[in-house]
Amino acid sequence: MYKEYSDLKDKRILVVGLGKTGVSLAHFLTKHGAQVTVTDHKSKPELSVQLEQLGELPIKFELGGHSPKTFIAQDLVILSPGVPSNLKIFDYARSQGIKITGEFEFSAGFIKEPIIGLTGTNGKTTVAKITEAILTESGVKTWVGGANEKPLVDYLRLDDKAQVVIAEVSSFMLEHCDTFNPGNIVFTNLAENHLDRYRSMEEYVNAKRRIFKNTNQATTSILNADDNAVVELARDPAVQRGRIFYFSRKPALEPQIMNIGGAVNIGDEIRVRTGPEIESFNIKGMKMRGKHSVENIMAAILASREHGATREAVQKVINTFTGLPHRIEYVRKVGGVMFYNDSKATNVHAVLRALDTFDENVILIAGGKDTNLNYEPLRTSVKRKVKTLILVGEAKERINRDLGDFSETFLIGTFEEAVLIAYQKSRIGDVVLLSPGCSSFDMFDSFEERGDYFKEIVRKFH
């Protein structure tokens, strides 16, 4: 793979997918002398905004479909995120000796600065943002991108580079990773997800496992000791090649973790060891709710300490970081009822974490696009915590089959109606929680749009 910008001169490169990433790639590649072709299954009118962003760049276009002859005339094919990697035309191109890669893998190869690679089913963006906050407070210049809609190629286009790059890495990105080798790997947790894309949980895990493919003695892996699937992954010889720091909320693991290095939560304290000394941080003033938030903070402390984070910066961020929108986000209190927006909860594991946050009676709004997930693991929490279950969207029947017997349940036609009924069913002291356990694409363009609509409805209540 190319490592220097000069390697791109006169190379014939095909960019598949003309979304935000495709546009950025086209700008970067043409600037460095590549002969660029862009292909997309959408038509010219559908891509008018993107085509305008490319202006007069010397690019060839193949729009409205993909032809084999375009693929086999290239030195390299780069797929934008979201383009399925299993299309038959890609198999054909590979059979003709054409190299196919993803934007993330391609862009990462040019980055000379240290990279923190963050993966896991949930928590990636929050850990990235806490890590960024700690390092920024410590005077370390960072750049955050990857799976959070800011492609790595955007970093390559910057003149003013960071000291540390924090990259969120999804399973889709890892499918194409052959050479990606971050100095630090953070693995937050591992649970069933994306089963509309993967044929089995094993296939999903194998995609995630690829982040460890190129580890060496200089790699530090930061792993969740409380997640059995992550601990199982840690037995992989590739992980064992480098140093491992574990983080845990189990005080019983404290002697073991302090011996090898890592972080442990005991009461209102996080104990951390990344060098000879053991440090303690107080979490009494922590603003975020939920036990999982403590896990996220521990992961971020360990990652940032590898890059010069100061003790003072860590404590300040613990005391001031308020969390991110759409992640157990407090909206408002109406008539003694608290409303929380957890629209980012697009899988079962995320809903479990949300329910675990509350001691109050919960009216849970769930449902969305059906991605073949199994909701049975929620039964105990629903039985214990959920007073009323409001189901909406494409997956409502599936969720009802798995959970409907464990709580008063309503299957609702529209999202707005679901929120209204949740409010009607609530009483003083209750929590109304939007934590869908599904992606948003049956009714909305994104989890952000879904969460914003929820907040808009709730703000009209009086």
Swiss-Prot record:
<dbReference type="InterPro" id="IPR036565">
    <property type="entry name" value="Mur-like_cat_sf"/>
</dbReference>
<keyword id="KW-0131">Cell cycle</keyword>
<keyword id="KW-0133">Cell shape</keyword>
<comment type="function">
    <text>Cell wall formation. Catalyzes the addition of glutamate to the nucleotide precursor UDP-N-acetylmuramoyl-L-alanine (UMA).</text>
</comment>
<dbReference type="GO" id="GO:0008360">
    <property type="term" value="P:regulation of cell shape"/>
</dbReference>
<dbReference type="GO" id="GO:0005524">
    <property type="term" value="F:ATP binding"/>
</dbReference>
<feature type="binding site">
    <location>
        <begin position="120"/>
        <end position="126"/>
    </location>
    <ligand>
        <name>ATP</name>
    </ligand>
</feature>
<comment type="pathway">
    <text>Cell wall biogenesis; peptidoglycan biosynthesis.</text>
</comment>
<keyword id="KW-0573">Peptidoglycan synthesis</keyword>
<dbReference type="Pfam" id="PF21799">
    <property type="entry name" value="MurD-like_N"/>
</dbReference>
<protein>
    <recommendedName>
        <fullName>UDP-N-acetylmuramoylalanine--D-glutamate ligase</fullName>
        <ecNumber>6.3.2.9</ecNumber>
    </recommendedName>
</protein>
<comment type="similarity">
    <text>Belongs to the MurCDEF family.</text>
</comment>
<dbReference type="InterPro" id="IPR036615">
    <property type="entry name" value="Mur_ligase_C_dom_sf"/>
</dbReference>
<dbReference type="InterPro" id="IPR039648">
    <property type="entry name" value="DHPH_N"/>
</dbReference>
<dbReference type="Pfam" id="PF02875">
    <property type="entry name" value="Mur_ligase_C"/>
</dbReference>
<keyword id="KW-0436">Ligase</keyword>
<keyword id="KW-0961">Cell wall biogenesis/degradation</keyword>
<dbReference type="GO" id="GO:0005737">
    <property type="term" value="C:cytoplasm"/>
</dbReference>
<dbReference type="InterPro" id="IPR013221">
    <property type="entry name" value="Mur_ligase_cen"/>
</dbReference>
<keyword id="KW-0132">Cell division</keyword>
<dbReference type="Pfam" id="PF00070">
    <property type="entry name" value="Pyr_redox"/>
</dbReference>
<keyword id="KW-0067">ATP-binding</keyword>
<dbReference type="GO" id="GO:0008764">
    <property type="term" value="F:UDP-N-acetylmuramoylalanine-D-glutamate ligase activity"/>
</dbReference>
<dbReference type="InterPro" id="IPR004101">
    <property type="entry name" value="Mur_ligase_C"/>
</dbReference>
<dbReference type="Pfam" id="PF08245">
    <property type="entry name" value="Mur_ligase_M"/>
</dbReference>
<keyword id="KW-0963">Cytoplasm</keyword>
<dbReference type="InterPro" id="IPR005762">
    <property type="entry name" value="MurD"/>
</dbReference>
<dbReference type="GO" id="GO:0009252">
    <property type="term" value="P:peptidoglycan biosynthetic process"/>
</dbReference>
<dbReference type="GO" id="GO:0051301">
    <property type="term" value="P:cell division"/>
</dbReference>
<dbReference type="GO" id="GO:0071555">
    <property type="term" value="P:cell wall organization"/>
</dbReference>
<keyword id="KW-0547">Nucleotide-binding</keyword>
